[in-house]
Amino acid sequence: MIDSRCFAESTINIVSVSGGKDSLAQWILAVENDVPRTTVFADTGHEHSQTMEYLDYLESRLGPVIRVKADFTRRIEGKRKFIAEKWPVSLVEECGMSHEQAAERIAKALEILKPTGNPFLDLCMWKGRFPSTKARFCSLELKHDSVRDKIVLPALEKYDEVILWQGVRAQESPARAALPMWEEDADNTPGLHVYRPILNWTHEDVFALAKRHGIKPNPLYQQGCSRVGCMPCIHARKSELAEIFARWPEEIARVAEWERLVAACSRRGNSTFFPSTHDPRRAEKRIEVVTVEEYGIASYRDWAMTTRGGSQYDLLAATNDKTVCSSVYAGVCE
């Protein structure tokens, strides 16, 4: 049952989709119930190509999707100015570099730090680092703010009520279990509300709804992925990272190249996709000794492919048939 407020006069529902199972379930619900809506996808530039192809498939089945992308051109220009003006002093006084070393680092940063048009890469180069568990700025900058600025704010000027649909479920985490199904005047914004229609659904429920409508799951779910947004996500499980190394080494190579670019835009020149403590056996907290070569994403292959705390190579994983479905969710391979 859809909340009746979603059908009120001068109301528009904004259904955010990602190519994942949960956003698909709420999208199907909106279509089933003929909810007045705008469907939107925030392109982060860090999705797998199969997810982008899957989004095209969903659009052919469920209707049009507005695609939005964050733009960091102005902020990158601001950082270039900051580097030119502030780094000559801070690199020497705070990072212990000589004036010659500082000049070399600054020249390299200014050579690299230019907009690429890829939101995720541009964000990380502007920040001089990758997102982390404690600094998860990716979702805010690439999804929340982009949808707010390009979809929500214009909608608030046109409609009395704007309802943001969020495909989150209580089963996912204690934090999400504590969320309400409806939030009035979200972000202290009159007329802006958040609705979570599948909050109490299970994994099985969301897959069953799609199956009932004859809609295929994102193929990444059948290839060992528990998440199908960013490839890889900073929260990727060890087993999931192993699948990525085995199935899509080109994605690892792409991120490794991004590490080189982002590191060049950081003061110490050593920004890595995963923190240097990711592998417990060689965890390093001394930031001054961390290098991209030693702790970049490519260095985690052996760790990802091992069991027993990283001490035993997983021969079964190495020889698995990658054409066979290996979903972590029950029922997906049926």
UniProtKB/Swiss-Prot annotation:
SUPFAM superfamilies: Adenine nucleotide alpha hydrolases-like. Keywords: Oxidoreductase. Pfam families: PAPS_reduct. The keyword Oxidoreductase applies. GO terms for molecular function: oxidoreductase activity. The keyword NADP does not apply. InterPro entries: PAPS_reduct_dom, Rossmann-like_a/b/a_fold, Sulfate_adenylyltrnsfr_sub2. Belongs to the PAPS reductase family. PANTHER family: PHOSPHOADENOSINE PHOSPHOSULFATE REDUCTASE, SULFATE ADENYLYLTRANSFERASE SUBUNIT 2. This is Uncharacterized 37.8 kDa protein in gpa 5'region. It comes from Escherichia phage 186 (Bacteriophage 186). The gene is CP84.
